UniProtKB/Swiss-Prot annotation:
Signal peptide: none annotated. It is a peripheral membrane protein. This is Bacterioferritin. Residues 1-145 form the Ferritin-like diiron domain. Fe cation 2 binds at E51, E94, E127, H130. InterPro entries: Bacterioferritin, Ferritin-like, Ferritin-like_diiron, Ferritin-like_SF, Ferritin_DPS_dom. Belongs to the bacterioferritin family. The keyword Ubl conjugation does not apply. It is an enzyme of class 1 (oxidoreductase). Fe cation 1 binds at E18, E51, H54, E127. PANTHER family: BACTERIOFERRITIN (PTHR30295:SF0). The lineage of its organism: Bacteria, Bacillati, Actinomycetota, Actinomycetes, Mycobacteriales. GO terms for biological process: intracellular iron ion homeostasis; iron ion transport.
Amino acid sequence: MQGDPDVLRLLNEQLTSELTAINQYFLHSKMQENWGFTELAERTRVESFDEMRHAEAITDRILLLDGLPNYQRIGSLRVGQTLREQFEADLAIEYEVMSRLKPGIIMCREKQDSTSAVLLEKIVADEEEHIDYLETQLALMGQLGEELYSAQCVSRPPS
């Protein structure tokens, strides 16, 4: 089934964002684990896997539309050296994604591609949850201070 070139371009742009997020979140997860924030690291790792599921769904859609998924392009990773920097970097990716997705959904509907629009709407719902989580963590960090916030995130060995 031949897809609209504009829809395919949008889907490949979104695929690039998902591939970038997978790598950034996974690296942040491993850094958090190394710093002793194992529960936080697990949450970040799960977010990386969520982005992988998005990439898979987008890839399937591009292939169905007789397009070629571009796995050779990836955006620059923003690697945070502190928890705050990591949350801010991850939030920046999410904001960029949302600025593309919402107009993209409208464009898909205008091009009579409701299936791609629904796929992107599902991704928006997931990204909104991640944005809420990241904004909450940054707000908590602001209220508690970075040291106290970080102390709350350290995993304690089982007793």
